[in-house]
UniProtKB/Swiss-Prot annotation:
Involved in the secretory pathway as part of the exocyst complex which tethers secretory vesicles to the sites of exocytosis. Plays a role in both the assembly of the exocyst and the polarization of this complex to specific sites of the plasma membrane for exocytosis. Also involved in assembly of the spliceosome. GO terms for cellular component: exocyst; hyphal tip; transport vesicle. Residues 23-42, 438-447 have a biased composition (Polar residues). Residues 247-256, 448-460 have a biased composition (Basic and acidic residues). Keywords: Coiled coil, Cytoplasmic vesicle, Exocytosis, Isopeptide bond, Protein transport, Transport, Ubl conjugation. Component of the exocyst complex. InterPro entries: Cullin_repeat-like_dom_sf, Exo84, Exo84_C, Exo84_C_1, Exo84_C_2, PH-like_dom_sf. Residues 16-101, 247-271, 432-495 are annotated as: Disordered. Gene3D superfamilies: Exo84p, C-terminal helical domain (1.20.58.1220), Exo84p, N-terminal helical domain (1.20.58.1210), Pleckstrin-homology domain (PH domain)/Phosphotyrosine-binding domain (PTB) (2.30.29.30). SUPFAM superfamilies: Cullin repeat-like. This is Exocyst complex component EXO84. There is a cross-link at K193 (Glycyl lysine isopeptide (Lys-Gly) (interchain with G-Cter in ubiquitin)). The lineage of its organism: Eukaryota, Fungi, Dikarya, Ascomycota, Saccharomycotina. Its main location: cytoplasm.
Length: 791
């Protein structure tokens, strides 16, 4: 191009003075890069997608590069603003040159305006992902330290294909190849995402496995520690026993001549009691293992002191009495005071009793379903009506309203369960009898107050037969320097003391009657004495009525006896105040003793009435409650009767509500709303019933005594609904309510409604119930204000 003719120079000058220039000549730089050919130079490219190679400038860049369209090595000796047509120096078709110029104009314009397939930055060839196999294209991984990605099509890499094939190709071919690379990129991106997701899942699973392993190791560590402790206890116990057994002969000889040992009195040698500690430790371990392996056992069994498992058996099946076929694998746990029934959650256990058992089914967890105290259930062996069930053993568990039949194929398991049940039940019955005898013993009776003992001592002093040490404030009796009678174990009781006093007074009076019979008859002393004695004997009839739970007859007899004793006391008082020289000390003493006996009978009657209220309140009708409270009024203990009635209603309310709690575990939000609605309805109905009973029965009795105070009832209602409000908040929080902060004034959490629809449904149940309370004169809206006004 150095030897241009003058005509060519003139033509160049005309082109230079053109008013309209091509788009790519708006840039004043000397070099014009093809957007498809700048990858190898490291410059920024705005191509559609990095194709891995670069194009040589088709219109001469002044850098000695070969023209990609003409193959000529054109040197530019003119300004970069000249309009140079590709291939102008080498001839060629003018139309094709115009097409090439237009195509390059489009691409350069797209590059300048940042549109279409242009890019904004260089491509990092070292971090390109591996391309998947598509058609005949094969990919090679990252090799060596450089990690060049090789995509071969017929043995050519991407760069080689661009330089050798696409450099002479059209824009359509370049665009097609770009689309091919774009598909490869999408496939690679998808594979990368899939690999990332899979790796994340593997990491999560590994984390979960590690956590479970850690928990098992911690549990194993604790179990091992407990095992070493128990082994240590056993070792210490064995060492102590060996020391006691192999005691030196000299020590045995020192103990042998003692009279205490010859008389059978145990020596003061220190005993080994470590086995008790080991036993309690084993019992605690059993309960912990039960709570761990039996779901729901903690709801039925409380870890009380000395509660332990006596026997357990898993070779049982619950029997359908309709067809006498086994239905559910069952595990029986016999405690010293309870019997717990558990079933397997999984249904994959064996259904045949001959093949099923604790080891025959799947290793599924147990679910506790029933639990009764041993004294409230009976266990009996029954026989199946089928003749082919001779090898099976059946038992029937009966409670008040439920009955279950269980079967086993093992006689040893049958014997183990029945013997453990009978042993535990008999021990419980015996302990309850001992407890009842202690409670009913007058030495522990609430009626033995200090005032009664003081009156008894005064009566004894007045009679002249008082001895120091007969009674003390602790309720014991020690006569004559602290000696106790070993023949009568209940001699220290108040009843025995009262009976002894009565007997001595009777004996003394009879001896006086023999010597002064006529004199006593003249002053009327024998008449009063005999009347008091007759009335005192009628107290035995009161005891008979109390033992038969005939409290109305007992109260009637007590009222008659009290009335007659009151008349006798008035007559004796009139004689003493009349100035007559009459000795009535014996009559007054016997009268005081009779009063104390009557007071004890009243206490026994009131205890029986309280027992009926507490245990039969759900079955008692209005007339029965009226009779009980009337009896309390006749005994002059109306306050105790009213309080006992309110306490029994509280216990009945708690028992009724506790039956709903079992079904709440693991429930949904709708179940929580239903539970709280039932809770509200039950509380309102029972409180409403209590208020109506109070107004119909108790209020008229109080009115007869001139007392119209009902503050006790109001306080009871407020306490019950305060507990209900706390319970409702407890279940609403986390399900329908969320906490949004703390109230600085009341130091209570501020709640907000999370599930508005369910919360409104609950309010639709709650508000009518509160309106029902207003119909009986009770307004407790202020207690539930924090729930009703939530937003």
């Amino acid at each position: 191009m150095d030897n241009l003719d003058p005509n060519s120079s003139l033509q160049v000058e005309k082109l230079r003075n053109r008013k309209s220039r091509a788009v790519w000549q708006n840039n004043n730089t000397t070099t014009h890069n093809n957007p498809y050919a700048n990858l190898s130079t490291g410059e920024k490219s705005r191509s559609r997608h990095n194709t891995g190679s670069s194009y040589v400038s088709p219109y001469g860049g002044g850098n000695g590069e070969e023209n990609a369209y003409t193959g000529n090595n054109n040197k530019s000796n003119t300004s970069g603003n000249l309009l140079q047509v590709p291939g102008a120096g080498g001839g060629g078709d003018l139309n094709s040159n115009k097409k090439q110029s237009r195509r390059m104009s489009i691409h350069v314009s797209a590059r300048q305006h940042g549109r279409s397939f242009s890019q904004t930055g260089p491509i990092d060839m070292a971090n390109l992902p591996a391309l998947p196999k598509i058609g005949g294209v094969t990919t090679s991984g990252v090799g060596g330290a450089g990690g060049d990605v090789m995509t071969r099509t017929g043995g050519l890499t991407i760069e080689q294909k661009i330089f050798k094939e696409l450099s002479q190709g059209s824009a359509a071919e370049v665009d097609d190849y770009y689309k091919t690379l774009l598909k490869q990129k999408n496939l690679i991106t998808r594979d990368i995402k899939d690999n990332i997701n899979q790796n994340q899942k593997n990491i999560l699973q590994l984390t979960k496995d590690l956590k479970e392993t850690q928990e098992e190791l911690i549990e194993l560590r604790g179990t091992t520690k407990e095992l070493y402790e128990v082994l240590g206890y056993f070792k210490e116990s064995a060492q102590r026993r060996l020391e006691l057994e192999f005691e030196p002969e000299t020590q045995k000889e020192l103990h042998s001549p003692q009279k205490s040992n010859q008389l059978g009195i145990p020596s003061n040698k220190k005993k080994d009691r470590s086995s008790i500690m080991v036993l309690k430790k084993m019992w605690d371990s059993q309960l912990q293992s039960l709570f761990k392996h039996v779901d729901g056992a903690s709801k039925f069994v409380q870890p009380l002191p000395n509660r332990h498992i006596v026997a357990e058996s898993g070779r049982w099946f619950e029997v359908n009495v309709g067809n006498w076929k086994p239905s559910y694998p069952t595990h029986l746990f016999i405690f010293n005071d309870l019997i717990l029934i558990a079933v397997k959650k999984s249904s994959s256990s064996s259904q045949e009793p001959t093949t099923g058992g604790s080891n025959g089914g799947s290793k599924s967890r147990l679910q506790a379903v029933q639990c009764w105290p041993l004294t409230q259930v009976s266990l009996q062996q029954i026989k199946s009506p089928k003749k082919d069930d001779d090898k099976m053993y059946f038992i029937n568990l009966k409670s008040k309203s439920l009955s279950y039949v269980y079967s086993t194929d093992r006689y040893d398991h049958f014997v183990k369960v029945t013997e453990a049940f009978n042993k535990g039940r008999n021990e419980m019955i015996q302990s309850e009898r001992l407890l009842d005898s202690r409670l009913s013993s007058p030495s522990n009776n609430n009626g033995d107050s200090k005032e009664e003992k003081r009156q008894l001592r005064e009566s004894l002093r007045n009679s002249g037969n008082y001895k120091e040490g007969v009674t003390d404030d602790a309720g014991g009796a020690a006569t004559g320097g602290g000696r106790k009678s070993a023949g009568t174990p209940n001699r220290n009781s108040t009843d025995y003391v009262l009976h002894d006093i009565s007997a001595r007074v009777h004996s003394r009076n009879r001896s006086q009657d023999l010597g002064n019979n006529f004199k006593l008859a003249n002053n009327g002393k024998s008449q009063f004495f005999n009347e008091i004695k007759t009335l005192e004997d009628r107290l035995d009839d009161v005891d008979v009525e109390i033992s038969h739970n005939q409290y109305a007859e007992a109260v009637e007899l007590i009222s008659i006896i009290e009335s007659k004793l009151r008349n006798i006391e008035n007559a004796l008082t009139n004689q003493r105040n009349g100035g007559k020289n009459v000795n009535i000390a014996d009559e007054l003493l016997l009268l005081d003793v009779s009063k104390l006996k009557i007071k004890n009978r009243k206490e026994n009657v009131s205890n029986g009435l309280i027992f009926d209220l507490q245990h039969n309140i759900a079955k008692l009708k209005q007339d029965d409650i009226d009779n009980i409270l009337t009896l309390f009024d006749n005994l002059e203990q109306l306050d105790r009767g009213v309080q006992g009635y309110l306490d029994s209603m509280s216990a009945y309310l708690s028992t009724t509500v506790s039956k709903l709690i079992v079904g709440l575990q693991g429930s949904t939000k709708i179940d929580v709303v239903n539970y709280l609605s039932n809770l509200m309805v039950i509380n309102v109905s029972i409180v409403k019933r209590t208020i109506q009973t109070y107004e119909q029965i108790i209020a008229p009795i109080l009115k007869r005594h001139g007392d119209v105070d009902s503050s006790g009832l109001i306080n009871w209602c407020i306490d019950e609904f305060t507990k209900l409000c706390k319970q409702i908040k407890k279940h609403l929080y986390g399900t329908l309510l969320i906490s949004s902060g703390i109230n600085m004034e009341t130091d209570e959490p501020i709640y907000k409604v999370k599930e508005r629809k369910l919360y409104d449904n609950f309010l639709k149940i709650m508000q009518p119930q509160l309106e029902e309370l207003k119909s009986v004169g009770l307004n407790v809206d202020y207690i539930f204000e924090s729930i009703l006004n939530l937003e």
